[in-house]
Amino acid sequence: MDTLIRMLDHHLSLVGEIIDRTDRLDDRALDESIELSVEGIDRDPTLRSVTNRLVGQLEMWVIAVEGGTRVPPGDDATPGRLKTRLQIVGPRFRELAVGALRDGRADETFIDATCEPPQTFTYGGMLAHVLTFSAVRRTMAIGALEREGIADLGAGDPMHFVGGVGADASTIKRNHD
């Protein structure tokens, strides 16, 4: 099992689940400030802005890796549009990440011309960045959903998604020599 790819799959799946649940909410709930903020991640986060950023981050990196110079504005952040955007960009981002890891190119660099001035990043660094910053945003989004009475996503913990369901430890017999 490639743990990084399983973590990426969990991320893409959970973002989709979060977006699906935002479709149940009105604009007030989507645009209400999220009280728990993490300095340096997002300014004045709302459920809408956080989910838009979760999808937009994937779009930005795909454009950068493919040599683009401009990231389109993500102003259409309705749940339906976010779902469509994720369905398009999720598989593309996954393909880039899987290809880089499979081919041993995690340390290979690419030029991100969407930055001013252009910057150089590694594929592995890009994936680590996405998984780390997205974990914070997913947690904020799940908290905002819970505030609105939608609590079926738990904490968004990847443990079971990545490693399967654990066994009841009370039934384990140990042999002592």
What are the residue ranges of the model-derived segments?
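Acidic catalytic patch
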Residues: 99-115
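Short, contiguous alpha-helical
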Residues: 5-24, 30-73, 115-177
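Helix-adjacent hinge/juxtasegments
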Residues: 63-104
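Secondary-structure boundary motif
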Residues: 24-27, 95-102, 147
